[in-house]
């Protein structure tokens, strides 16, 4: 799949059991995971290729990660988005737990 307006180039769930999940997400340079939060789970990020930018609110925080770097956890209920911070496709893992998965969309001004 080439660069597009789709939210993600690719999403694959590598492991999922009650209360825990590992996802692989691929973003082209113009794509991002939109603003959202999770009711119960925390996100930890690990970059496989490219660069990503994690933007969080309450308090405002910006984290950039490259290959082999990780960050987390993003606390439950803390609004965040993830974007490609480079000019090449970025691929990263998201480890999520402990609790039931949900994705609660937010507006940029929430």
Task: Locate predicted features.
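Short acidic-glycine-tyrosine-enriched beta hairpin
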Residues: 59-77
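Conserved short histidine dyad/triad with adjacent acidic residue
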Residues: 23-38, 76-77
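A short, N-terminal "cap"/entry segment at the start of jelly-roll beta-barrel domains
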Residues: 1-21, 34, 66-67, 103-110
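Short histidine-centered beta-strand/loop micro-motifs
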Residues: 13-15, 33-39, 56, 63-64, ...
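Short, conserved beta-strand element in jelly-roll/cupin
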Residues: 26-27, 39-54, 95-97
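Ligand-binding loop in jelly-roll beta-barrel domains
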Residues: 75-101
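Short beta-strand segments in beta-sandwich/barrel cores
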Residues: 32-34, 50-55, 70-71
